[in-house]
Amino acid sequence: MRYMQDSSMPCQDASPPDVGAAPRRATRAVRVQWGGRTVTVGGNASVVVQSMTNTDTADAVATAIQVKELAQAGSEIVRITVNTPEAAREVAAIREQLDRMGVEVPLVGDFHYNGHKLLTQFPECAQALSKYRINPGNMGGGKRRDDNFAQMIEVACRHDKPVRIGVNWGSLDHELMARKMDENSRRAQPWEAQAVMRDALVVSAISNARRAEELGLRSDAIVLSCKVSHVQDLIAVYRDLSARCDYPLHLGLTEAGMGSKGIVASTAALAVLLQEGIGDTIRISLTPEPGGDRTREVIVAQEILQTMGLRAFTPMVVACPGCGRTSSTFFQELADSIQSFLRRQMPLWRTRYPGVESMNVAVMGCVVNGPGESRHADIGISLPGTGEVPAAPVFIDGERTVTLKGDHIAEEFQAIVEDYVARRYGAGITHQE
């Protein structure tokens, strides 16, 4: 008879399980610059958060306003569509408006079909952008495609701009795909069509990067992406791509969708890759709800990186989901109120209180886990549940400090949080690991 080992017995020579993401894959460092600001993608730099406007770029005022909103939300690079002469003509004006507002976030021009013409005809547009996104699948076919691609790379070299070669399965080079399918038909054991498509995406990205280098673009001025809209395909494509090259990689699940579906799908795909050390910059391609806030994609990107422990952007609130023990929705309202308060304060706190972005706050709804979670947090409050004494103890750095009662618990706790931030981080005390 076999017996299971008693898990309470100490193990000789046992090591604790590894915690944390795998080491980042080694990539070249690409510098995206504007004014006095440099955002490094790849190398040893942190994973960069990107976003994209959905305004008509020909409307310079609306586009500049949205770029500012995205930058203030935390986007470190913002991409804008450049699809018409009218749009290209306004890019320099958008850049000028942003500079006047003190917004030095680098702009990336997103080009399809006619980018070679627009960059050539509007040199002020080419200069005002910090980076170009090129989709080799939307540049025509045969020699025309090669000439158009070469023309865009020549402009990038002339203006010393980095380029993202972004391949998308919705616009994959038809000639390349046909060739890959033909090669597959001659295999002893042909691959399924989806596998051929994934291979074609990777081949397209890398071969175009090599061609760009042959045309004179520096290897440290190239970023690659291969976007698909299915989670498992994206994971497989980027694993393959990362194994075949050392260019920095831009991650994103294209057409992720709306609301919770888009957030869940993007998180499921990107979290796996980031955990494996793959990915140097990310963008969450959410379809906004009607009248929704475009900055939502920035917040989701930040939350993915922060919850994985890869970066810290804003203090995070831990809150219980609620159950039959919680007597009201007050703790939920308080958790939401505190998280919103923390985000509102971050533009000021980021410069005044270094390290505050790593602070953890707990807002709990009953005695079961409330005191424990509150002690684990930097600062926490445990609200009373059903049948409990109507009092809310506050814990600071693991110690119970004060008990709040009455109708003004929310206001009093917010004031305690603000005082704690000023005392702890204003004194230059770093966040405890």
Swiss-Prot record:
UniProt xrefs under InterPro entries: Dihydropteroate_synth-like_sf, IspG_bac, IspG_bac-typ, NO2/SO3_Rdtase_4Fe4S_sf
Keyword annotations from UniProtKB, A to Z: 4Fe-4S, Iron, Iron-sulfur, Isoprene biosynthesis, Metal-binding, Oxidoreductase
Polar residues biased stretches: 1-10
Binding site for [4Fe-4S] cluster: C320, C323, C366, E373
Catalysed reaction, written as an equation: (2E)-4-hydroxy-3-methylbut-2-enyl diphosphate + oxidized [flavodoxin] + H2O + 2 H(+) = 2-C-methyl-D-erythritol 2,4-cyclic diphosphate + reduced [flavodoxin]
Record's keyword annotation contains Oxidoreductase: yes
Gene Ontology MF: a single term: 4 iron, 4 sulfur cluster binding
Gene3D superfamilies named in the record: Dihydropteroate synthase-like, Sulfite Reductase Hemoprotein, domain 1
SUPFAM superfamilies for the chain: Nitrite and sulphite reductase 4Fe-4S domain-like
A GO biological process held by the record: terpenoid biosynthetic process
Protein's UniProt name: 4-hydroxy-3-methylbut-2-en-1-yl diphosphate synthase (flavodoxin)
Underlying gene: ispG
